[in-house]
Amino acid sequence: MKHALIIAGSRGLGFGLVREYLSRGWHVTATARTPSDELAALRGDADGRLVIESLEVTLIAQTAALATRLKGQSFDLLFLNPGILLGRGAALSDVPDSDIQNIFLTNAISPIRVADALAYLVVPGGTIAFMSSDMGSVSTNDDGRAELYRASKAALNSLIRSFRARHDKDDLTVLALHPGMVRTSMGRPDAPLDVDTSVRGLANVIEARWGSGGQVFVDYRNEIIPW
């Protein structure tokens, strides 16, 4: 039975991914800063296939502690889902420095730090997936909206490519995934996709690209996005 490690799996798309992989018969280990009631309830219905671990992704010490707790386990999939949206619609000159630091630390730096700490737990031929966004595509940025969020995801994409280069001898598939425009607390209330549709598509993409190696930036329909 396959085993997924989902980082930031308590709410929104992360929770949807936990639910999706459980429905496919996987074992799932999900991390959360503070587990939601929904995640705790899901554990009770999962017949022992869901483990919840505590993690604040921006704290290096907590990441190291998680790596120690998980030592000896192996995972077919490591999915890194941390993300926040700050300064929506604000001019960069109006966004506090603390918000700028927080969004880059959460959206770009921390996913790579966690991946570096946990990559050794991924089985040969396994997959490391990062929740990116088409807004992180530099070459398709024609409207400039959501500048801070867009820049943080572009930074994540650059770091994903560096991560893959550092792990070029490892038998891994590395995916930067765009979930589509989804109705979540971070998304728009009028977004065209619900969480279930998005995560089902993401899981299908991961399955379709299993064992392909290399790296790719792709959306939930398995369509390539230019970096």
Q: What are the functions of these language-model segments?
A:
Residues S10-E20:
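N-terminal Rossmann NAD(P)H-binding glycine-rich loop of SDR-like oxidoreductase domains
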Residues R24-A40:
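Conserved glycine-rich Rossmann-like NAD(P)H-binding loop of the short-chain dehydrogenase/reductase
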Residues R43-A61:
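Rossmann-fold cofactor-recognition segment
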Residues I84, R88-F104, I109-I112, A119-Y120, ...:
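Catalytic loop of short-chain dehydrogenase/reductase
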